[in-house]
């Protein structure tokens, strides 16, 4: 496209600096920010945030060395990119280790995931069993998308009968 695309290492460095800038903007510290990639004379956020102490930060991904460490250090939520129970369980364990290393309470991080591989209308009972397994791991939200559904309205209506059971799974997971 004609726009330089930095290598992965530099993109993660920039992301971390952007998170540091956001944290500083949302605090009482309006002083300068001097990073490797960004330098700001002031970090002012006017008007201030409505959510206190700051808006929640969600970081998506599953990279074990960088992404999940950034989640442990800066985020309130993690959207895992994983496709099966074992992988999600492993990523959560890695995130817990990062939290331990940083002195972060893992329970303060909301775990979400993309469920594009799940096909709730093909096998509703299997889908519900799978969701229950994810809930037991601590996943509190699974994003579903119909993909290239010929009739998205029919897809959503097909999910309607599953809602009471999904609600029960959610209640059991949190209560």
Question: What are the language-model segments listed below?
Answer:
Residues 1-175:
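Active-site-adjacent structural elements that line small-molecule/cofactor binding pockets in enzymes
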């Amino acid at each position: 496209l004609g726009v330089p695309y930095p290598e992965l290492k530099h993109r993660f460095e920039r992301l971390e600096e952007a998170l540091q800038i956001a944290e500083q903007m949302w605090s009482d510290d309006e002083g300068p920010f001097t990073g490797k990639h960004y330098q700001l004379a002031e970090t002012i956020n006017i008007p201030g945030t409505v959510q206190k102490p700051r808006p929640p930060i969600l970081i998506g991904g599953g990279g074990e060395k960088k992404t999940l460490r950034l989640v442990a250090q800066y985020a309130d939520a993690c959207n895992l990119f994983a496709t099966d129970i074992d992988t999600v369980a492993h990523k959560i364990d890695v995130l817990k280790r990062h939290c331990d290393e940083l002195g972060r309470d893992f329970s303060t991080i909301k775990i979400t995931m993309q469920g594009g591989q799940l096909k709730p209308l093909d096998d509703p009972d299997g889908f519900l069993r799978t969701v229950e397994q994810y809930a037991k791991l601590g996943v509190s939200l699974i994003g579903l998308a119909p993909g290239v559904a010929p009739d998205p309205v029919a897809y959503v209506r097909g999910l309607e009968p599953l809602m009471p059971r999904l609600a029960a799974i959610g209640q059991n997971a949190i209560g």
